[in-house]
Structure formats: C-alpha cells, structure tokens
A protein has these predicted regions:
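FIC/Doc superfamily catalytic core
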Residues: 1-187
Length: 187
C-alpha cells in the first residue's frame, strides 16, 4: 500500500485534532452519543484540514460529502459500540471500533487511520488505560495490520465472519503490546 509522507502540514492538523480531543475530554463528551457524533466527524475534519477557515472553505464540497457518507456508515459502528460498552475491556472496544471504521466501506472518505487512532486513544483515555502513539518503532506493524483491515469488507459475509474477527484480535494484541505509559494522563 502507498503510504502518505508525514509533512509539517499533516503534523499540524493532527496536533489541532488532538487539541480538539482534549477539549472534548474536558467536557466529557461521549463521541458515540447522538449529540457526540458531530464531534466525531469534526475530528476527521481536523486531521485533514485543521481549524483553518480558508482551508475548510477550499475543501467545503469534500467536507459535505464526508458528512453525507458518515451518517450512513456510522450506524452499525455506533450500534456495536453501544452494545459492547461496559461488556468488553477498553482495548477490545478500541480495536473493535478501529476495525469497523477502517474496513470497507470506510467511515470517512479520507483520514481514517489518523481519525481512528485519535478515537481509539479517546476510548483508552476515558478508561485510564495506556495510550497508543505511532512511533518509528511501531509504525510499520501499525500500518501493516491496518492495511489488512482496510482490505476487508463489512459487506462481504466471509470477511465479516472470518477476517474481521481475526483482524480485530490481531489489532487488539498489537495495541496491548504497543500502548505506552509514557503517554498517559499522569505522565
């Protein structure tokens, strides 16, 4: 799979999105509540455009198309999250969300890896778990397992029954191994 080069502009947008995520955490926003869904899609807009109004204007049609597709694609993911909240541990929930949003059809038009990483850390942070930050040491494995997930489809029964659970388990194990106390709330 072709990997996008990490530029200063991409890094700035990701930092902007993390700042927004910090605001959401301070307000105790539930991203998977009906009211929180706007904030969830805003995270995607932030990782792609930041909060710069000129850039947002430039990508206005893309933002509108993303919102339209998002509202159709979030339902099964949100249902799964609600059904499993409190039943599964935070790493299982994080991996389950990430797999479901990254497989086909992807939740967003672009920025699924970046937004997914933010949201899985939001889930872990809410439960006071260690966070996962992509580093030079974890990037290759993260992108490899993410690439396998990305090639799976929620709409193909074989993928849904066989591949997706396997990918979720692999990603969950990767998260548990790679999460670091260096990025916790207390560090």
């Amino acid at each position: 799979l072709q990997r996008e080069e990490m530029t200063d502009e991409i890094s700035a947008s990701i930092c902007d999105a993390y700042g927004y995520l910090n605001e959401l955490m301070a307000k105790d926003v539930d991203l998977f509540s009906l009211a929180g869904l706007h904030s969830l899609i805003e995270l995607n807009h932030r990782v792609l455009c930041g909060s710069d109004t000129r850039k947002r204007y430039e990508f206005h049609s893309h933002i509108l198309e993303t919102r339209k597709k998002f509202h159709g694609r979030i339902r099964p993911i949100r249902s799964w999250m609600i059904k499993n909240a409190g039943r599964l541990d935070p790493y299982e929930i994080s991996a389950g969300f990430y797999c479901r949003m990254l497989c086909q059809p992807q939740l967003f038009i672009e920025g699924n890896h970046r937004t997914g990483n933010l949201v899985l850390n939001y889930i872990l942070l809410k439960e006071n778990e260690k966070l996962f930050v992509v580093t030079d040491e974890t990037a290759f494995d993260y992108l490899e397992v993410s690439g396998a997930i990305k090639l799976s489809s929620m709409k193909r029964w074989r993928d849904n029954l066989l591949k997706l659970p396997s990918h979720c388990g692999t990603f969950e194990a990767f998260l548990r191994r790679s999460a670091s106390p260096d990025y916790s709330r207390d560090s």
